[in-house]
Swiss-Prot record:
<protein>
    <recommendedName>
        <fullName>UPF0598 protein C8orf82 homolog</fullName>
    </recommendedName>
</protein>
<comment type="similarity">
    <text>Belongs to the UPF0598 family.</text>
</comment>
<dbReference type="Pfam" id="PF14956">
    <property type="entry name" value="DUF4505"/>
</dbReference>
<dbReference type="InterPro" id="IPR028108">
    <property type="entry name" value="DUF4505"/>
</dbReference>
Amino acid sequence: MWAMSGALRPWALILARSPGARTYAGGGGVSYTQGQSPEPRTREYFYYVDHQGQLFLDDSRMKNFTTCFKDPQFLVMFFSRLRPNRSGRYEAYFPFLSLCGRERNFLRCEDRPVVFTHLLAAGPAPQRLSYCGGGEALAVPFEPARLLPLATNGRLYHPAPERAGGVGLVRSALAFELSACFEYAPGAPELPSHVRWQGRRFALTMDLAPLLLAAPPP
């Protein structure tokens, strides 16, 4: 169990074990019950992260700010243990897995499992991008030259931890702020070619494109 999630995990367990708990049947023929125990002393839970970086129980009927998980400790524990799902269970529908002892926490995502939500305040140290509500504890160095604007969906991407797929989505509000720093080549208004950041001009490397485009859709 998540040792620190006293307010959150009991709620999830009550939901899963209550007489009203239901088996969820999603697309692709997948079905599960929150808190199911496929083998002794093992529990399985199922989650979903949206394009804003909000984490929900996957079978929540309403997915909004009110129903998402907000406890920073829980979010840090969950996302810091995130790995590709190679468990042999639900791999096609839940491509990522966060393990806590004998508890399996499966994750699917609207776009990417890592969603950058905030650019942390500048200081003497290099700037960092924080993701999925984890503050300083879930952050990577900000690399402006490696920002990837994708014309096919109008979204912005940035390098993420390799264990979480190597590419993260930038939340729309933050992407809008960063887009003011882009420069476009003459006659090519679709995609920027450079970014200006803190008085410097960087050519966009676009090196994330092969990794992102090669990934199967979630």
